[in-house]
Amino acid sequence: MIVGAGGGADMNARGAMGRYGETLAARRLTGAGMTVLERNWRCGRTGEIDIVARDGDVLVVCEVKTRRGGAFEHPMAAVTPDKAERLRRLAERWIQTHGGAPPGGVRIDLVGVLLPQRGAPVVEHARGVA
C-alpha cells in the first residue's frame, strides 16, 4: 500500500463517506415510496449498482454520488455519458439475472449527497438521468 496515493486511511474515509451517502440515499428513496431491492449489486468486472429499487412497476437503478462541502465537483454533475452507458449495461445484466424486465420498464436515477462542513446533509434525487 502506498500512503498518499489513494490508499490507507484516506481510502477508508472515502469508503465510509460513500456508504453513509448510500444509506442517506436509500432513506430518501424509501421515503418517496420506493422499495429498495438491493444495495451494492456487483456484476464481475462490469461494475456495481449502488441501489436497485422498485417504484411501482418501474425498476430503478440508482447511482449515488457523495461529496464533502467545498468539493470541486457537485455530486449531481458526476454522471458522464460513459457512466450512463455503464449503468444501462448494468441494468440489463441485473434484469437478465433477476427474471426479466418489469412491466413499467427501467429508469436510471441519481442521488447526490452533499456533506457540508456544518449542518445537515443535502440529498437531491434526480429521476431518469440516463
UniProtKB/Swiss-Prot annotation:
GO terms for molecular function: nucleic acid binding. Pfam families: UPF0102. Gene3D superfamilies: 3.40.1350.10. It comes from the Bacteria. InterPro entries: Restrct_endonuc-II-like, tRNA_endonuc-like_dom_sf, UPF0102_YraN-like. HAMAP family: UPF0102. Belongs to the UPF0102 family. NCBIfam families: PRK12497.3-3. This is UPF0102 protein SCO5602. The lineage of its organism: Bacteria, Bacillati, Actinomycetota, Actinomycetes, Kitasatosporales.
